[in-house]
Curated annotation (Swiss-Prot):
Keywords: 2Fe-2S, Cytoplasm, Iron, Iron-sulfur, Metal-binding, Pyridoxal phosphate, Transferase. Homodimer. Forms a heterotetramer with IscU, interacts with other sulfur acceptors. This is Cysteine desulfurase IscS. Master enzyme that delivers sulfur to a number of partners involved in Fe-S cluster assembly, tRNA modification or cofactor biosynthesis. Catalyzes the removal of elemental sulfur atoms from cysteine to produce alanine. Functions as a sulfur delivery protein for Fe-S cluster synthesis onto IscU, an Fe-S scaffold assembly protein, as well as other S acceptor proteins. Gene3D superfamilies: Aspartate Aminotransferase, domain 1, Type I PLP-dependent aspartate aminotransferase-like (Major domain). Pathway: Cofactor biosynthesis; iron-sulfur cluster biosynthesis. Signal peptide: none annotated. It is an enzyme of class 2 (transferase). It comes from Ectopseudomonas mendocina (strain ymp). It is found in: Cytoplasm. GO terms for biological process: [2Fe-2S] cluster assembly.
């Protein structure tokens, strides 16, 4: 077993060796290095063929038409293109948007920007289980609502929203639905023939593909219109200009092909690993699972260890690569905004650790990690005067602390 152990698969995944092999064939002079937009020679035609094959592979994972897949640089760009693109195009119909408080920053910062431009945004509060329900969305709908944006799987707590039901509601009310699915490809079944979703964002690097490439699904029937955010050569049917990186697109296509093939078996294996890990911690005092344990992807376990500061626990677990909060906000010492929205107090939000498992995680690693976590938590609690007070039966919420 090699140390440190990587248990942060929701931040990024390593590229699958099969993906790396396919990508390497699109780089060198004797490989498929051409510009897919070069229409006058065989190098361009071959590159275009590879890119279109990859587009088909992405579409097949989510049961979409390849013509509905637009290449982007990642899910952040896809979220921006979908939300700003729709808001601006349909602004004459209305300027009200609905999203949730626990979306990824790529969605929240985009809606904040639209608020500065005069749009009105309603931020839904999830239940304690971390889920956004159709009833919550329905209660917020107005006559001037043009877009609802709700994530499929939450990046911090791994909860799965019932997108099919939310889609039935939005379609019946003539409102467009955007879904950030960066964390769900290869983990949850997605069928865009059945789901009434209008726009969906994807990322390659959360699914064992390369960083720097993603895609946006844009429904053709009924047709969704977007205002482009990047202008140039009119690539991707005018929605997203810029020379396509053949090797990146091919990498994402291969990653999604493997995801489609291996998803059922992989989910079974990873569920067993997560449950094995959790069983070894379950008996600990003041241990809380954040988010629903049932409506959740197998890869994620987000735990709060009360009376232990999350950052100090991460430092104590130097052999484990884990995180508190999402990778995009893990540099901030603020408590997780996702856990605060679930109703967790600051102390519990601060004491949370996200463990995420993946394709290359082994049983041996999981057992080692669980033992290390128990050891570190016990040690840090021994040092904590708050833990002593709690053990003595002091109600810490009623203590009036002296100010300095």
């Amino acid at each position: 077993m090699k140390l440190p152990i990587y248990l942060d698969y929701s931040a990024t995944t390593p590229v699958d060796p099969r993906v790396a092999q396919k990508m390497s064939e699109c780089l060198l002079v004797d490989g498929n290095f051409g510009n897919p937009a070069s229409r006058s020679h065989v190098f361009g035609w071959k590159a275009e063929e590879a890119v279109e094959n990859a587009r088909r592979q992405v579409a097949e994972l989510v049961n979409a038409d390849p013509r509905e897949i637009v290449w982007t640089s990642g899910a952040t760009e896809s979220d921006n293109l979908a939300i700003k693109g729709v808001a601006h195009f349909y602004a004459s119909k209305g300027k009200h948007i609905i999203t949730s408080k626990i979306e990824h920053k790529a969605v929240l910062d985009t809606t904040r920007q639209l608020e500065r431009e005069g749009f009105e945004v309603t931020y839904l509060e999830p239940g304690e289980d971390g889920l956004i329900t159709p009833a919550m969305v329905e209660a917020a709908l107005r006559d001037d609502t043009t877009l609802v944006s709700v994530m499929h799987v939450n990046n911090e707590i791994g909860t799965i929203n019932d997108i099919a039901a939310i889609g039935e509601l939005t379609r019946s009310r003539g409102v467009l639905l955007h879904v950030d699915a960066a964390q769900s490809t290869g983990k949850v079944e997605i069928d865009l023939e059945k789901m009434k979703v209008d726009l969906m964002s994807f990322s390659a690097h959360k699914t064992y593909g390369p960083k720097g490439v993603g895609a946006l699904y844009v429904r053709r029937k009924p047709r969704v219109r977007l205002e482009a955010q990047t202008h140039g050569g009119g690539h991707e049917r005018g929605m997203r200009s810029g020379t396509l990186a053949t090797h990146q697109c091919v990498g994402m296509g291969e990653a999604f092909r493997i995801a489609k093939e291996d998803m059922a078996a992989e989910n079974q294996r990873i569920t067993a690993l997560r449950d094995r890990f959790y069983r070894q911690l379950e008996g600990m005092e003041e241990l809380y699972v954040n988010g629903s344990l049932t409506a959740r992807v197998p890869h994620n376990l987000n735990l709060s260890f009360n009376y232990v500061e999350g950052e100090s626990l991460i430092m104590a677990l130097k052999d484990l690569a884990v995180s508190s909060g999402s990778a995009c906000t893990s540099a901030s010492l603020e408590p997780s905004y996702v856990l605060r929205a679930l109703g967790r107090n600051d102390e519990l939000a601060h004491s949370s650790i996200r463990f995420t498992f993946g394709r290359f995680t082994t049983e041996e690693e999981v057992d080692y990690a669980a033992a290390k976590v128990r050891e570190a938590v016990d040690k840090l609690r021994e040092l904590s005067p708050l833990w002593d007070m709690f053990k003595e039966g002091v109600d810490l919420s009623s203590v009036e602390w002296a100010a300095h």
